[in-house]
Regions:
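Polytopic membrane enzymes that build or remodel cell-surface glycoconjugates and lipids
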Residues: 1-480, 487, 491-505, 509, ...
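TPR/Sel1-like alpha-solenoid repeat signature
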Residues: 432-439, 451, 465-476, 485, ...
Length: 646
């Protein structure tokens, strides 16, 4: 009884300690903002999550693949966050941290339940909790899919062990459903059935393969006394493999639908294989030396000797693992866990432009943590006292906590993140683009252009830096130069939505409305799912006095993004011109509801209310408009058409 009570106390103390080291590193993220690199795509500008939990939004999450991924459960988690926290990034960060805490504690409890080795399980959980390579998965809100899917991965492993204790379909079904939920969070979980096969070998010991494991005494009782042939264990996983096959098909469909899968013409197969081999080796380096971590690693020109050395290194490890797999069964489990779970993201099927990514190591490194933990115990237990081992372990965790704390700081904002990335990588097209975009927001035009020029050197055939330079010219008021640059970008890529959109905006500002409308319509033809394009098209029609066309465009924008304050305001102004005052009032009030400090909506709402004889309410909204923007004291109410889009 006392032993059982002591074990429970140890589990509680370890769980609290794991939580404490995570909070020590990640507490700061509550003050961080969104990153202008996928956070906009998944959260800030993703109108699909802004409408809350409705039947329509849930169906949309289950059917839409606009990001190039099918992960409806992750979309729903962002939806819930937006309901709770809105655009307060701190709340979104906390959700990711809490899920990471759950993952680390569950990982500890799982290995302790599976092996009975409480302190080894604690060390694995601590490494997972605080290793700096996992910072990207936790501190980057857009990577919610990583932490959320891992939660279901660990839960599925728990349910699998529960099933193994007393196999039945009633126990298999919860595991099956949990795995399905994990795949709906991120398809990287497709390798889980193969990891379960590894666990069948060790520590579940369900196979007929003999083991000479010295650590079997640590397992309090056999989880399953029955031994199975490998073929039987594979057949047992067939329903899970069926889900894997479905997920793979959905993933390919989603990626192909938005063109995120790189063709072999862009990145030949031999280069992909070379990069995969070197990346496997580089991940191992980051395990032991987690510095110079970056949000994006560009592909490098790898020499034959680099690929050969990496391949030889991996081959030697694999040979050692195979040689000692009977004596040290954790070696093949950990090593093939690492190799196997990286397969979907190692780059043979290239999605995106990265050579490798820290976030991809979140799950695979668990396999390496198994090897490090059990291997170190076997090496040192007869040579060093338990107290010294405990002290060394504590120092390792402390050092990793400090490094992780420093790594988290790079995620405070976009500028800091990409500045660091440029410092630790070379020829990084994506990082230069991120820096340039941030510099434009800060009105540091010349510095931004410098980064865009570097991008042109790195990839002269890319339209992206030209679009950026065009935006810079536009901000400077050099519209002719901006137009010429956008047209140059369109020569390189006639289907550049950003080039058409930005060109249309400059033409709109210059009063060349027919040309602007043509560019907006071309952009909509390329991407009819962008409400901003419809809103800007409506503005151009409204400027021309084509109110009916403008109303159609604004309604199209609101159909896609109902909570668009700007579109409601602009629609209200056009309706006001048509003397449809009640409809105009409804739209102005909705704009103010969505954006209380919307001076333009307050001002023109006051004008309509005054015309309807509602003087007191009209005066309130007029005063609000002037409070927000004193320029509304002298504005000519009859020139409202000029304020379309404000």
């Amino acid at each position: 009884m006392n032993k059982h009570k002591s074990a429970n106390q140890n589990r509680l103390i370890i769980s609290i300690s794991v939580i404490a080291i995570i909070l020590a590193s990640y507490w700061q993220v509550q003050n961080y903002g969104f990153i202008s690199y996928d956070d906009q795509l998944y959260i800030v500008d993703n109108y699909r999550i802004h409408s809350g939990f409705t039947f329509k939004s849930i169906v949309d999450a289950l059917t839409n693949v606009h990001t190039g991924h099918w992960h409806p459960l992750t979309i729903m988690s962002h939806m819930l966050d937006w309901n709770l926290f809105g655009d307060n990034a701190g709340g979104h960060h906390w959700t990711s941290v809490i899920i990471h805490i759950l993952n680390a504690v569950l990982l500890f409890l799982f290995f302790q339940y599976l092996t009975g080795a409480i302190w080894k399980s604690a060390f694995i959980a601590a490494l997972f909790a605080i290793h700096p390579i996992n910072v990207e998965s936790v501190a980057w809100i857009a990577e919610r899919k990583n932490v959320l899917s891992t939660f279901f991965w660990i839960l599925t492993m728990f349910l699998y062990v529960w099933y193994v204790r007393s196999p039945s379909w009633k126990r298999y079904l919860p595991m099956f459903l949990c795995f399905a939920l994990g795949l709906m969070a991120k398809p990287m979980l497709v390798t889980l059935p193969f990891v379960l096969l590894l666990l069948d070998y060790w520590p579940l010991n369900r196979t007929i393969i003999n083991q000479q494991n010295k650590n079997q005494a640590e397992i309090p009782e056999p989880i399953s006394l029955k031994k199975y042939k490998i073929t039987s264990l594979i057949w047992e996983k067939v329903p899970l493999l069926f889900l894997t096959a479905i997920s793979i098909c959905l993933t390919f469909y989603a990626a192909k639908s938005v063109g995120t899968i790189a063709s072999l013409n862009i990145l030949p197969l031999n280069k992909r294989i070379s990069n995969a081999i070197v990346s496997y080796a580089l991940y191992l380096k980051k395990l032991f030396w987690p510095i110079d971590l970056a949000v994006f690693y560009p592909h490098l020109d790898l020499s034959l000797w680099q690929v050969s050395v990496a391949a030889l290194f991996l081959l030697i490890i694999t040979i050692i693992v195979c040689k000692y797999f009977h004596k040290y069964p954790y070696l093949p489990v950990g090593w093939f866990w690492y190799l196997g779970t990286l397969v979907p993201v190692i780059g043979i099927v290239q999605v995106g432009g990265q050579a490798m990514a820290d976030r991809y190591a979140y799950l695979p490194f668990i396999g390496l943590f198994i090897i490090v933990t059990w291997g170190a115990a076997d090496i040192f237990k007869k040579r060093i006292s338990i107290k010294i081992i405990a002290m060394i372990s504590a120092l390792i965790i402390l050092a990793l906590t400090v490094v992780a704390h420093c790594q988290v700081k790079y995620w405070r904002d976009t500028f800091t993140l990409f500045s660091h990335t440029l410092n630790v990588t070379k020829n990084n097209f994506i990082a230069h683009n991120g820096m340039a975009s941030e510099l434009l927001k800060q009105d540091k035009i010349e510095e931004a252009i410098t980064h865009y020029n570097v991008m042109l050197i790195l990839d002269p055939k890319s339209d992206i830096p030209l679009v950026g330079i065009g935006r810079a010219f536009s901000i400077k008021g050099e519209n002719d130069a901006a137009i010429a640059t956008f047209r140059q970008a369109l020569k390189l890529n006639p289907e550049s939505i950003e080039a058409h959109h930005n060109l249309g905006f400059v033409l709109f500002q210059m009063g060349r409305l027919d040309e602007a409308i043509a560019e907006y319509q071309k952009a909509i033809e390329l991407n009819g799912d962008n409400p901003t394009l419809y809103n800007n098209l409506g503005n151009a029609f409204a400027k021309q006095g084509k109110d009916i066309e403008a109303i159609k465009a604004y309604n199209a924008a609101l159909l896609i993004r109902p909570r668009d304050a700007g579109a409601h305001n602009n629609l209200g102004m056009v309706l006001m011109h048509l003397y449809k005052y009640d409809e105009a009032i409804r739209n102005f009030k909705e704009a103010i509801h969505l954006q209380p400090e919307y001076a333009n909506a307050h001002f023109y709402l006051s004008e309509i209310l005054k015309r309807k004889g509602l003087s007191a309410e009209a005066e309130y909204h007029l005063n609000e408009a002037i409070r927000i923007n004193s320029e509304y004291k002298n504005i000519d109410k009859l020139q409202s058409r000029h304020n379309i889009g404000k």
